[in-house]
Amino acid sequence: WCGWCPRGAVALAEMEATPNFIGIAVHNADPMAISSYDGSLGTYVPGGYPGGGVDRVLSGDPSDFSTMHASRVNDVVPCGVNSIAAFYDGTTNKISVSTEIEAFGEMSGDFRLSCVIVEDDLESTSSGWPQANYYAGGGSGTMTFPSNINGGYSFSTTNAQSVPAADFGGYDHVARSLSSNDILG
């Protein structure tokens, strides 16, 4: 339904090689949506889809990820994540995640960790999976994945207003599980 959302997918793909950037695609009104994440996202990223945010502090257009990330990446943080371990239990079909942080001095305030499990290469031919595409035919500008990602697929050179996920290599960075179903951690 979101014909401008290829801009978010391409922007996340462009950031993949950037150190210390973890991209998360939050979906809305499609089979990949997590209602608790989607419903609370406007707290940090106002303005609708596709929107972009960095560190729950900055928000803007996904095309500004690089600038937003650069303005935050060297900020002093109160702690660091030393380790993350994930364990899959095939019997229960659940993933358990544990982490260890290191505080860089005294910490006061309400600090929380939130874990988001993301998945790449999601495809389906079921209803709700094709990507609406307002960039079709190039009239709304160029919107193309980097050449080394998703085959450099271009949403602007196709004339398709609805693009099957398999055509562009599938959805990447998709939030699939949110710890405690709470964006606040």
Task: Please report, for each region that a protein language model flagged, where it lies by residue.
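Short, conserved sequence motifs used for protein processing/export or organelle targeting and
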Residues: V10-A11, P19-G185
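Conserved redox-active cysteine motifs that mediate thiol-disulfide chemistry
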Residues: W1-A11
